[in-house]
Protein backbone atom coordinates (compact mmCIF):
# COMPACT_ATOMS: atom_id res chain seq x y z
CA UNK A 1 0.00 0.00 0.00
CA UNK A 2 2.75 2.42 0.94
CA UNK A 3 4.70 1.56 -2.21
CA UNK A 4 1.68 2.43 -4.31
CA UNK A 5 1.23 5.75 -2.53
CA UNK A 6 4.86 6.72 -2.95
CA UNK A 7 4.74 5.90 -6.63
CA UNK A 8 1.50 7.77 -7.20
CA UNK A 9 2.12 10.81 -4.99
CA UNK A 10 5.89 11.07 -4.37
CA UNK A 11 6.13 14.83 -3.79
CA UNK A 12 3.03 15.29 -1.55
CA UNK A 13 4.21 12.49 0.74
CA UNK A 14 7.60 14.15 1.12
CA UNK A 15 5.93 17.42 2.06
CA UNK A 16 3.22 15.88 4.24
CA UNK A 17 5.27 15.83 7.48
CA UNK A 18 5.74 19.60 7.21
CA UNK A 19 1.99 20.10 6.81
CA UNK A 20 1.26 17.87 9.79
CA UNK A 21 3.80 19.85 11.80
CA UNK A 22 1.92 23.03 10.90
CA UNK A 23 -1.29 21.49 12.15
CA UNK A 24 0.40 20.58 15.42
CA UNK A 25 1.72 24.13 15.70
CA UNK A 26 -1.83 25.41 15.30
CA UNK A 27 -2.97 23.36 18.25
CA UNK A 28 -0.09 24.65 20.39
CA UNK A 29 -1.20 28.27 20.05
CA UNK A 30 -2.12 29.74 23.43
CA UNK A 31 -5.88 30.22 23.40
CA UNK A 32 -8.79 30.38 25.79
CA UNK A 33 -10.90 28.16 23.53
CA UNK A 34 -11.05 24.42 24.16
CA UNK A 35 -12.29 22.74 20.99
CA UNK A 36 -14.04 19.35 21.29
CA UNK A 37 -12.15 16.31 20.02
CA UNK A 38 -14.50 15.95 17.05
CA UNK A 39 -13.61 19.49 15.94
CA UNK A 40 -9.90 18.65 16.09
CA UNK A 41 -10.52 15.51 14.04
CA UNK A 42 -12.44 17.52 11.47
CA UNK A 43 -9.61 20.04 11.24
CA UNK A 44 -7.06 17.27 10.72
CA UNK A 45 -9.12 15.66 7.96
CA UNK A 46 -9.72 19.06 6.40
CA UNK A 47 -5.98 19.74 6.38
CA UNK A 48 -5.28 16.49 4.55
CA UNK A 49 -8.09 17.10 2.08
CA UNK A 50 -6.88 20.61 1.26
CA UNK A 51 -3.34 19.35 0.77
CA UNK A 52 -4.18 16.55 -1.67
CA UNK A 53 -7.26 18.09 -3.30
CA UNK A 54 -6.99 19.69 -6.74
CA UNK A 55 -10.64 20.69 -6.99
CA UNK A 56 -12.73 23.41 -5.34
CA UNK A 57 -13.01 23.52 -1.56
CA UNK A 58 -15.99 21.77 -0.04
CA UNK A 59 -18.77 24.01 1.34
CA UNK A 60 -18.36 24.99 5.00
CA UNK A 61 -20.26 22.92 7.52
CA UNK A 62 -22.35 24.23 10.38
CA UNK A 63 -19.65 23.32 12.90
CA UNK A 64 -16.92 24.98 10.85
CA UNK A 65 -18.89 28.23 10.63
CA UNK A 66 -19.56 28.14 14.37
CA UNK A 67 -15.91 27.48 15.13
CA UNK A 68 -14.32 29.98 12.75
CA UNK A 69 -16.81 32.82 12.49
CA UNK A 70 -19.07 33.00 15.53
CA UNK A 71 -17.70 34.27 18.82
CA UNK A 72 -18.89 34.63 22.39
CA UNK A 73 -18.31 37.43 24.90
CA UNK A 74 -14.78 37.31 26.24
CA UNK A 75 -11.88 39.35 24.94
CA UNK A 76 -13.03 42.96 24.22
CA UNK A 77 -13.98 43.26 20.55
CA UNK A 78 -11.99 46.48 20.24
CA UNK A 79 -8.78 44.85 21.50
CA UNK A 80 -5.87 45.63 19.18
CA UNK A 81 -4.72 42.00 19.19
CA UNK A 82 -8.18 40.45 18.76
CA UNK A 83 -7.66 39.16 15.23
CA UNK A 84 -4.13 37.90 15.83
CA UNK A 85 -5.41 35.91 18.81
CA UNK A 86 -8.56 34.53 17.20
CA UNK A 87 -7.22 33.86 13.70
CA UNK A 88 -4.45 31.67 15.08
CA UNK A 89 -6.56 30.20 17.88
CA UNK A 90 -9.31 29.14 15.46
CA UNK A 91 -6.91 28.06 12.68
CA UNK A 92 -8.44 30.32 10.03
CA UNK A 93 -6.50 29.61 6.85
CA UNK A 94 -7.14 28.50 3.27
CA UNK A 95 -4.91 25.99 1.47
CA UNK A 96 -2.03 26.61 3.88
CA UNK A 97 -2.20 30.39 3.46
CA UNK A 98 -3.59 32.99 5.80
CA UNK A 99 -6.78 34.61 4.52
CA UNK A 100 -6.53 38.24 3.37
CA UNK A 101 -9.57 39.23 5.42
CA UNK A 102 -11.96 37.63 7.86
CA UNK A 103 -15.00 38.48 9.98
CA UNK A 104 -15.89 37.39 13.50
CA UNK A 105 -19.53 37.87 14.51
CA UNK A 106 -21.02 38.08 18.00
CA UNK A 107 -24.20 36.10 17.38
CA UNK A 108 -25.70 32.61 17.50
CA UNK A 109 -25.69 30.23 14.53
CA UNK A 110 -29.49 30.08 14.34
CA UNK A 111 -29.59 33.87 14.02
CA UNK A 112 -27.00 33.78 11.25
CA UNK A 113 -28.84 31.03 9.37
CA UNK A 114 -32.09 33.02 9.40
CA UNK A 115 -30.34 35.73 7.39
CA UNK A 116 -30.16 33.25 4.48
CA UNK A 117 -33.90 33.75 4.03
CA UNK A 118 -33.80 37.55 4.04
CA UNK A 119 -34.02 39.64 0.89
CA UNK A 120 -31.13 39.79 -1.57
CA UNK A 121 -28.88 42.85 -1.70
CA UNK A 122 -25.71 43.62 -3.69
CA UNK A 123 -22.54 42.13 -2.23
CA UNK A 124 -19.43 44.13 -1.47
CA UNK A 125 -17.89 43.16 -4.80
CA UNK A 126 -21.07 44.06 -6.69
CA UNK A 127 -21.22 40.71 -8.48
CA UNK A 128 -22.91 38.09 -6.33
CA UNK A 129 -26.17 38.32 -4.44
CA UNK A 130 -25.96 38.50 -0.67
CA UNK A 131 -28.51 38.25 2.12
CA UNK A 132 -28.53 41.09 4.64
CA UNK A 133 -29.36 40.98 8.33
CA UNK A 134 -32.36 43.01 9.46
CA UNK A 135 -30.65 44.27 12.60
CA UNK A 136 -27.21 45.48 13.60
CA UNK A 137 -24.62 42.90 14.62
CA UNK A 138 -21.40 43.41 16.55
CA UNK A 139 -18.23 41.93 15.14
CA UNK A 140 -14.60 42.35 14.22
CA UNK A 141 -13.13 42.84 10.75
CA UNK A 142 -9.65 41.35 10.34
CA UNK A 143 -7.33 42.66 7.62
CA UNK A 144 -4.05 40.86 6.91
CA UNK A 145 -1.12 43.30 7.12
CA UNK A 146 1.89 40.95 7.25
CA UNK A 147 2.03 37.33 6.15
CA UNK A 148 4.82 34.97 7.10
CA UNK A 149 5.19 31.21 7.11
CA UNK A 150 2.36 29.53 9.00
CA UNK A 151 1.73 29.94 11.91
CA UNK A 152 3.10 33.54 11.90
CA UNK A 153 0.97 36.46 10.70
CA UNK A 154 -0.24 39.93 11.67
CA UNK A 155 -3.77 41.29 11.33
CA UNK A 156 -5.33 44.68 11.87
CA UNK A 157 -8.41 44.43 14.09
CA UNK A 158 -11.36 46.75 13.48
CA UNK A 159 -14.49 46.66 15.65
CA UNK A 160 -17.72 47.11 13.70
CA UNK A 161 -21.41 47.21 14.44
CA UNK A 162 -23.50 46.98 11.33
CA UNK A 163 -25.56 44.92 8.91
CA UNK A 164 -24.12 41.51 8.01
CA UNK A 165 -23.94 40.55 4.32
CA UNK A 166 -23.59 36.81 3.75
CA UNK A 167 -23.75 34.30 0.92
CA UNK A 168 -25.60 31.04 1.48
CA UNK A 169 -25.73 27.61 -0.11
CA UNK A 170 -28.29 24.81 -0.16
CA UNK A 171 -27.53 21.89 2.14
CA UNK A 172 -29.11 18.68 0.83
CA UNK A 173 -28.83 16.71 4.06
CA UNK A 174 -30.48 19.44 6.13
CA UNK A 175 -32.78 20.60 3.31
CA UNK A 176 -31.99 24.16 4.30
CA UNK A 177 -30.01 27.15 3.16
CA UNK A 178 -26.93 27.57 5.33
CA UNK A 179 -24.35 30.36 5.65
CA UNK A 180 -21.45 30.00 3.22
CA UNK A 181 -19.29 33.12 3.51
CA UNK A 182 -19.37 36.45 5.36
CA UNK A 183 -19.12 39.10 2.66
CA UNK A 184 -19.18 42.28 4.72
CA UNK A 185 -20.25 43.97 7.94
CA UNK A 186 -21.66 47.32 6.80
CA UNK A 187 -21.76 50.11 9.35
CA UNK A 188 -24.70 52.50 8.84
CA UNK A 189 -23.76 56.12 8.03
CA UNK A 190 -23.45 58.42 11.01
CA UNK A 191 -26.02 60.78 9.57
CA UNK A 192 -29.59 60.04 8.56
CA UNK A 193 -30.06 57.50 5.80
CA UNK A 194 -32.49 54.88 4.62
CA UNK A 195 -32.40 51.66 2.63
CA UNK A 196 -33.59 51.75 -0.97
CA UNK A 197 -35.60 48.92 -2.49
CA UNK A 198 -32.33 47.37 -3.66
CA UNK A 199 -31.05 47.29 -0.10
CA UNK A 200 -28.45 50.00 -0.72
CA UNK A 201 -27.85 52.78 1.77
CA UNK A 202 -29.03 56.12 0.39
CA UNK A 203 -27.88 59.24 2.21
CA UNK A 204 -30.49 61.94 2.39
CA UNK A 205 -29.34 65.56 1.76
UniProtKB/Swiss-Prot annotation:
Disulfide bonds join 116-168, 123-130. Keywords: Disulfide bond, Glycoprotein, Secreted, Signal. Belongs to the pancreatic ribonuclease family. Gene3D superfamilies: Ribonuclease A-like domain. This is Inactive ribonuclease-like protein 9. Glycans are attached at residues 131, 143. GO terms for biological process: defense response to Gram-positive bacterium.
Amino acid sequence: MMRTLITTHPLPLLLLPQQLLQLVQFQEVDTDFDFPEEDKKEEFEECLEKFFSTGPARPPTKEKVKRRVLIEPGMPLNHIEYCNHEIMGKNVYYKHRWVAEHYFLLMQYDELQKICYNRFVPCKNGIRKCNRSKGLVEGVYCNLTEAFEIPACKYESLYRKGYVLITCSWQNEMQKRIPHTINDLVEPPEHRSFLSEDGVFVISP
